[in-house]
UniProtKB/Swiss-Prot annotation:
Annotated binding of heme b b562, by residue: H83, H182
Name under which the protein is recorded: Cytochrome b
Entry keyword Electron transport: yes
Annotated transmembrane regions: 33-53, 77-98, 113-133, 178-198, 226-246, 288-308, 320-340, 347-367
Keywords recorded for this protein, A-Z: Electron transport, Heme, Iron, Membrane, Metal-binding, Mitochondrion, Mitochondrion inner membrane, Respiratory chain, Transmembrane, Transmembrane helix, Transport, Ubiquinone
Superkingdom field: Eukaryota
Subunit field text: The cytochrome bc1 complex contains 11 subunits: 3 respiratory subunits (MT-CYB, CYC1 and UQCRFS1), 2 core proteins (UQCRC1 and UQCRC2) and 6 low-molecular weight proteins (UQCRH/QCR6, UQCRB/QCR7, UQCRQ/QCR8, UQCR10/QCR9, UQCR11/QCR10 and a cleavage product of UQCRFS1). This cytochrome bc1 complex then forms a dimer.
Residues annotated to bind a ubiquinone: H201
UniProt-recorded Gene Ontology molecular function terms: metal ion binding; ubiquinol-cytochrome-c reductase activity
Source species of the chain: Dactylomys boliviensis
Note: Heme 1 (or BL or b562) is low-potential and absorbs at about 562 nm, and heme 2 (or BH or b566) is high-potential and absorbs at about 566 nm.
Lineage, highest ranks first: Eukaryota, Metazoa, Chordata, Craniata, Vertebrata
Cofactor needs: heme b
Function noted in UniProt: Component of the ubiquinol-cytochrome c reductase complex (complex III or cytochrome b-c1 complex) that is part of the mitochondrial respiratory chain. The b-c1 complex mediates electron transfer from ubiquinol to cytochrome c. Contributes to the generation of a proton gradient across the mitochondrial membrane that is then used for ATP synthesis.
Length: 379
């Protein structure tokens, strides 16, 4: 009699995905982030569901309802901070996951990579709308500034903005629809994650060497289940430290002031995980140019498979490309820092230089370096 795990229509899908899946024997801790992102998504959906039970999507009561959750609901403070800081962990892991993909050439799995980029857009949209819901000062003004960017679209822009707002400014209608979208998007993301995994399992996982590993595979369980559980424990430790010791470390103090359309905060800025893109947006004086640069700064990820000119897949044996990749990381850290600074000298110039460097490294230097390395190896 065949094992139920291998014959049952539903259980065998789980079996082929997480138990009997043949995995490369040499994948490092950089391959842990996929499972960590899955855990983060589950955590966000569960905590979000409990928050939605007590939250009211109305401009007059939204801020008070969040305060009520923190003060009066049993462990409400824990749920709220787990959700807020869980989002930060989500983005840390997302950026590590994408960085891993760039470093080890995982983007050559075209379908998996492109679904991944769409997932990034969906997660960014969800996080942005979630930031609006507490209806603090930064929520309101962040929503106003970011939605206003759409007015840069020629001809239909201003109409589009008013259509999204549901009026002539960010108000009750905007908050209600943002809550609706913020609730539904994580489920759409979950479906997209399944497609992401479906495409990944068509090809099998990449590995640090970038070479075909068909000749040396090991079962996912117990080897990588144990490894993933260890990663989850480390994540739980970091997240609990953040929630219990400094829950507001990554937040903005302005969001503890209720939204006031008559009083603009001195420095409007998004959450830390959007600062790099915000810095690129601000570095271009023209409104439409800034919006295009902002969108392209993420969309550029889709060009990676086309820009891969090296004869080797991974950067493991390409020291020159490795240097560029780490320069790109440093550049993104600089952009993140600049995004949080006021628009004044010398930050404007640094931001413009860092933005130019970002596009130059990806579009010009990395492909050139790949060709140079091919020449050095006489390929």
């Amino acid at each position: 009699m065949t094992n139920m795990r291998k014959s049952h229509p539903l259980i065998k899908i789980i079996n082929h995905s997480f138990i009997d899946l043949p995995a490369p024997s040499n994948i490092s801790a950089w391959w842990n982030f996929g499972s960590l992102l899955g855990v983060c998504l589950a955590l966000q959906i569960i905590t979000g569901l409990f928050l939605a039970m007590h939250y009211t999507a109305d401009t007059t009561t939204a801020f008070s309802s969040v305060t009520h959750i923190c003060r009066d609901v049993n462990y409400g403070w824990l749920i709220r901070y787990a959700h807020a800081n869980g989002a930060s962990m989500f983005f840390i892991f997302l950026y590590f996951h994408i960085g891993r993909g760039i470093y080890y050439g995982s983007y050559t799995f075209m379908e998996t990579w492109n679904i991944g980029v769409l997932l990034l857009f969906a997660v960014m949209a969800t996080a942005f709308m979630g930031y609006v819901l507490p209806w603090g000062q930064m929520s309101f003004w962040g929503a106003t500034v970011i939605t206003n960017l759409l007015s840069a679209i020629p001809y239909i822009g201003p109409t589009l903005v008013e259509w999204i707002w549901g009026g002539f400014s960010v108000d009750k209608a905007t908050l209600t629809r943002f809550f609706a979208f913020h609730f539904i998007l994580p489920f759409i993301i979950t479906a997209m994650v399944m497609i992401h995994l479906l495409f990944l399992h068509e090809t099998g996982s990449n590995n640090p060497s970038g070479l075909n590993s068909d000749s040396d595979k090991i079962p996912f369980h117990p080897y990588y289940t144990i490894k993933d559980i260890l990663g989850v424990l480390f994540m739980a430790l970091a997240l609990l430290m953040l929630i219990l010791f400094s829950p507001d470390l990554l937040g903005d103090p302005d969001n503890y002031t209720p939204a006031n359309p008559l009083n603009t905060p001195p420095h409007i800025k998004p959450e830390w995980y959007f600062l790099f893109a915000y810095a690129i947006l601000r570095s271009i004086p023209n409104k439409l140019g800034g919006v295009l640069a902002l969108v392209f700064s993420i969309l550029i990820l889709m060009l990676f498979p086309s820009l891969h000119l090296s004869k080797q897949r991974s950067m493991s044996f390409r020291p020159l490309s490795q240097c560029l990749x780490w320069i790109l990381v440093a550049n993104l850290i600089i952009l993140t820092w600049i995004g949080g600074q006021p628009v004044e000298h010398p930050f404007i110039t640094i931001g413009q230089l860092a933005s130019i460097s970002y596009f130059c490294i990806i579009l010009i230097l990395m492909p050139t370096m790949s060709l140079t390395e091919n020449k050095l190896l006489k390929w």
